[in-house]
Amino acid sequence: MYERAMLSKNFDHAANEQRIYAGWEHGGAFAANPASSATPFTIMIPPPNVTGSLHMGHALTFTLQDSLVRWRRMQGRDVLWQPGTDHAGIATQMVVERLLASEGSPGRREIGRDAFLDRVWRWKAESGGNITHQLRRLGASLDWGRERFTMDEGLSAAVRDVFVTLYRQGLIYRDRRLVNWDPQLQTAISDLEVESREVRGNLWHIRYPLEDGEGSIIVATTRPETMLGDSAVAVHPEDERYTALIGKCVILPLTGRRIPIVADTYSDPEKGTGAVKITPAHDFNDFAVGRRHDLPMPSIMDREGRITLAEITCTEATDIADPAFVTGLEGQERFAARKAIVARLEEMGFLETIETHTHHVPHGDRSGVPIEPLLTTQWFCNAAELAKPAVAAVESGDTRFVPKQWENTFFAWLRDIQPWCISRQLWWGHRIPAWYAPDGSVYVAATAEEAQAAYGGSETLTQDEDVLDTWFSSALWPFSTLGWPEDDSILSRYYPTDVLITGFDIIFFWVARMMMMGLHIQKQVPFRDVYIHGLVRDERGQKMSKSKGNVIDPLALIEAHGADPMRFAICLLAGPGRDIKLGPKRVEDASRFVTKLWNASVFCERNGVKPEPGFDPATVTLPLSRWILASADDAIRAATQALEAYRFDDYAATCYRFVWNTFCDWFVELAKPILLATDTPEAAEIKAVAAHVLGVVLRLLHPAMPYVTETLWDHFGYGPEFSLIRAPWPEVGVSDPAREAARQEIDWLVRLIGEVRTVRNEMNVPPSTLTPILLKDAVAETVARAERWRDQIARLARASSVTSLEGALPKGSAQAVLDEAILVIPLEGVIDLDAERTRLTRERDKARDEAAKVVRKLENADFVARAKPEVVEENRDRLAALEADIARLGAALERL
């Protein structure tokens, strides 16, 4: 214990947090112990990007994880919370490319691959630790000695091993398929790196003449430039308008190519004209149609998003075909080509109408440009085959989703999963372990030497230029970080992991793929539970975005209030299956809770409360002592059950109620008169009980509020410095009849004082005014209780007397029910009863009027359908608050 004269007036988070964290870290408090006989508890950090900075999503995920691991550590489990960062292929490459540009240095392609990668590694060494420093500020008790990076040599070896294994099993292969192509970054990107943006554009209706000259068919498209690569027109097989045309052909304007009219259910008769142009090489749905009908798939765009004509043909010039115009499109940027094509179609009479049209266009989330579905040769993984055991594991209960509803999302994605494009046209990342011979043959091996040996020729093989999708290495995270494939000793102890805590947005991209790889490579699920949390929104329920100006910086909150209030606010709001509405006010409220705990501790210290070695709670005799011990047991039981069920909100609410209401508001207040008589046995018992319960409080709160609790634990001398983190989780004591009787008696006292305070508050009785309390219809035991606690009732309920009432109620009395008795508080002459009735009636009527307006709004189906979800939710919350006010005001009127 470090020495302090007395606790200061307030907890100074700035002076204590980093000091305490360093004490924990240097003392090995976070470290797992593989040699321990304790049951392991393993949880994997979702590795943040090495380029990242702490945002509220991180704060949510890591607060919940840290609360869980601190609790399990206190339960005596051998906790491994595995830290690390992701190499973040595109993000990191862009950061370093921008850095080179800002320095005026030559670009990536000018300096070459090796020099560029050296520069990335230097940047990582200099700046890549930013996010891990910020996680320390949050209080995350990660086992930093085991920190991993997805491009560490050990993890890279695991990546190569898995790639080679899957390739040899036929589960990784090369294919020419459509991918999301970013023309600016010039790489394939994952669906997670694509964001849909609403764009106000046009829907062009274009006339395609029938080959037999007997009319034409009209198609509608938002992308007329892709018509150069059309292979068919699709109509629904049951659309009577086009039944007679199925099997016939149209002549494609501009190129003059002959393309068929095919029947396919992809075409929606209710949408547009019901006829759809099919461009298999530039649309994912069209690609599927093309494969079903064995259509040609000419690509008309290069990797920079420019028109290329290498794969298409034109007929001679006719009134339909204009080969000279088409030839002139070669090399044009796609949107410039669009304008030219629309203009030429209009000149030739094929543009039927132009309709203003708002639609969603996929954009690269980093480049900001519209992505292009592009037919390219890439490496793919047979995700459908790998998904089958993952689906079965969830169906059987080997892996459990919490909340359970997320299982449906998991199943929906995995039962309709497409081949996973795992190659990226980048330099930063795990280079694909495939080598090519001069004749184009492919040799997949863990090393160049193995590939060369397999080839057997004298020519030097050339390694594939591409790197793997970042999610490929992330999918191996639960076992690659534990030493596989080189050393299985740690893996056998800590795998499978116990729980994964993450957001719903990466169930498919990360959770599902970890399950695929874990089951296929390790033959075990990677985690037993998957806890899915929602998004962090602002206090109005709106999604945070820079454009709205409502982004909350967690580090700014930590600087202003400390990590504890932010962490506690997050836990308090983290209910299952719902988003978190977090604003500065929530953190300020939690900061007041920290202050409440601190003030109670100051009170205890000033009244001589300190840990009593050998104190046995079973020996106490005072009803107040027995009551607070029973209440502490209730809190321990409820907090433990909540954490076991991942109900972080219930855990935090339990702690809040017990500390603020039970311990501070009632125990401390009821203990004050006893503590004034400093040398009595009663005072000694209350001090010992207070010290014991404060120790329980600090341990209960530690998972969510580690800094203030460790500070107080150290200060009071409950254990050596920095020892709360490994102190045992409190256990429920043995119940006995005396403790239960004390619980009933003090609970009765608390309810009586609470009812009187409510009446006085509702009736606007001045705090300085004492009022008598009359007990009508009270049984003998109630009267005896009132007598035993007369002084406390008088002090805390502002009562001039507490007596039984026989006969009629005094005129102008307020009433409240307490068990079998009626509490009567005479108010004649204390307040203006008529004025009070008028005030209460006026406030109730106003609340009713406001509630009626909100009800009308919520009953308006058009409002509910059109308004933003957060606005509808605000109105529902407002209605609930108004209904509570109406009930409260009605009850107050009934009291009169």
UniProtKB/Swiss-Prot annotation:
Enzyme Commission code: 6.1.1.9
EC category name: ligase
Reactions that this protein is recorded to catalyse: tRNA(Val) + L-valine + ATP = L-valyl-tRNA(Val) + AMP + diphosphate
Keyword set, alphabetical order: Aminoacyl-tRNA synthetase, ATP-binding, Coiled coil, Cytoplasm, Ligase, Nucleotide-binding, Protein biosynthesis
Pfam families: Anticodon_1 (PF08264), tRNA-synt_1 (PF00133), Val_tRNA-synt_C (PF10458)
Example of a GO MF term: valine-tRNA ligase activity
Protein name (record): Valine--tRNA ligase
Naturally occurring in which organism (per UniProt): Granulibacter bethesdensis (strain ATCC BAA-1260 / CGDNIH1)
Gene name, Swiss-Prot/TrEMBL: valS
